[in-house]
Amino acid sequence: MNLILLLVIGFLVFIGTYMILSINLIRIVIGISIYTHAGNLIIMSMGTYGSSRSEPLITGGNQLFVDPLLQAIVLTAIVIGFGMTAFLLVLVYRTYKVTKEDEIEGLRGEDDAK
């Protein structure tokens, strides 16, 4: 299970990097969003799923236990990532409406084009 999760995280980081290195602004926003999903998976993988610890209040059981603090952190990170993605999409939309450009090369001024 951990190997599959590691491969998924690596694939998400690879795809996010590929998208961020693009010149299209929408792809850059999608790449940043994919990075946040990879970060959430990294945080979730730090949980103690599969260890021999049991729940803190039940003393007679031998059931598996997942740390709820990491789940709360990931839930908060999902909300923050959603807000950041929404803000970046509005920023790209407004930039497109003002400049009629959706690529980074077109946003450079006349002085920067040299």
Curated annotation (Swiss-Prot):
It is a multi-pass membrane protein. Belongs to the CPA3 antiporters (TC 2.A.63) subunit C family. One of its GO terms (biological process) is monoatomic ion transport. Pfam families: Oxidored_q2 (PF00420). The keyword Transmembrane helix applies. GO terms for cellular component: plasma membrane. This is Putative antiporter subunit mnhC2. GO terms for molecular function: antiporter activity. May form a heterooligomeric complex that consists of seven subunits: mnhA2, mnhB2, mnhC2, mnhD2, mnhE2, mnhF2 and mnhG2. The keyword Ion transport applies. It is found in: Cell membrane. Keywords: Antiport, Cell membrane, Ion transport, Membrane, Transmembrane, Transmembrane helix, Transport. It comes from Staphylococcus aureus. It comes from the Bacteria. InterPro entries: CPA3_antiporter_subunitC, NUOK/Mnh_C1-like. The chain crosses the membrane at residues 3-23, 28-48, 72-92. Expression of the mnh2 operon in E.coli is not able to catalyze Na(+)Li(+)/H(+) antiport. It does however confer higher growth rates than the control strain at up to pH 9.5. The operon may encode an NADH-ubiquinone oxidoreductase.
